[in-house]
Amino acid sequence: MNELQTKVNEANNIFPVEAFKVPKVPEKLFGFVNQGFFPKLNPKGLNIADNVASLFEQYSLKQASLKDFDILLEKKNDIVLEHKVRYNFALQFHFETTYVGTGGEINLQFALQASTTNFSSLEELQASFSKTGDNLTAQLFWKPTVTKLVSGENDLTHIAQTAIGESLFDSRVDLSASIINSEATLKTAEATFTTQVLNPFKAEREKALAIKKAEEEKIKKELEEQKKRQEELSKQQRDKEALQKSLWNFQEFISYWTGQGKDVKQKEQFIQALEAAFSTNWNEVFNLLIAGFRSAIQTYYKDGKADQSQNAKIAFGEKGIQFPKSGPGLDGIFMSDFLRGNLTGNAHFDLKLKKVEVKNTQGKDAQGNDKKASINWQAKQNNFPFRQVNPWDFSFEVELKYEGSYGLYPGARFLNLFGSLGIPNDWKGEMSVKFVLDGKTPQWIADKPDYPGSLFKFEKNQLKFTPHVKEHVHVENKQFMEKLKSQNLHNLELATGATKPPVVDLASYLHYLILNHK
């Protein structure tokens, strides 16, 4: 029984359950022997009172041992016939058991005394036995006696003794199964116990463990996948934040893309980086490009002179910056071909750039910070109608300040006697050419047949861009200024013909700043 209990405990150790769910060897094992087997070492088999037996429901057998066994021939006087003597054989068992459970250990020591019927002769003794086939049975009278019952630190011996009392039980004992063939009987019971109780319990615990491991593995895998997803999301978030930070200014842009393995001083790789950033952060990229547009103009015309450096040529080409131009002569001023021919055909203009000022006129947001430039999508993402109205949200001014002069050619002076030119014969002084750039292209300009289109288009290592531009030309000479006003040069909205909006490589301005960065 102890060996079976050890195997049950080992099976339970595979994946433990509560003690009361562990198969109880005494209860199960003695359920596989016949009714006449004696003794059955479980509460039911010993007819122990329910209030005592209930103590063991939450416990499993840890150890059981037979401490003492004796057979006695007892002699007693007949209670009816005064001089007659009767005998009986008495079997005495002394057991010690230990049970374990959630409440600790229970130590139970008990005695079991079984007696044959009283007899006065061998014939009477023989008559008390009965044989049917191979089964030999006898009537036994027996009673259990608790000698010790301790649960943890609680001594329950007296309670158990009181509950059991002096009850005497009788049963028909199968001596063949209990004594003569006891070894075979118990082996059969153990085999049945192993097959019907131990093996299924072990399989159940193994299955439970497998399920538990599968669940743990599933949870582990889910946690790993969750961790991986979280790491990916964190990385994506870090990458997103790093990319967004790179769009704060061109220095951050250089640092970020250098870390991504791109040399943004190379125009092709620079355009690739812009396109990649623009695909997810178009407004931030646009804001950076517009800021670069402003800063590059200011830097290019530092000290009032156009930059002739190699970096400027790499960024803008041999012809220099596309917009605004500063000469020679009237080349930096937008006007009709008729007026340009009229002026340059009758006089020699000498304009010297003295200063360029760039001013951000975008305004402030609610927090008092400069408003950011943005794109007003009016079609599918990353695309524009060819003639989109108000495609951008930005605004800045560029003012070119000149000192200059002109003198009419002799023939022109003669004609001017009759007021045909409408300008002074000679002029010397300051001229201001201010360009107001924004994204507020009106419908009437977008509808012009030669409108270049609302361009924001990556093409052949360029980013073609069409701003909305107004030109304001101002001179102090009243007569000359009136001539300019008559041609609307004081407030010219670039729309068509020789005065249609410029198309610039917007990327070249930011690239110019990057090339100059050390």
Swiss-Prot record:
Matches recorded under InterPro entries:
DUF237, DUF240
- What family is reported? Belongs to the MG032/MG096/MG288 family.
What name does UniProt use for this protein?
A: Uncharacterized protein MPN_048
Tell me what organism the protein belongs to: Mycoplasma pneumoniae (strain ATCC 29342 / M129 / Subtype 1) (Mycoplasmoides pneumoniae)
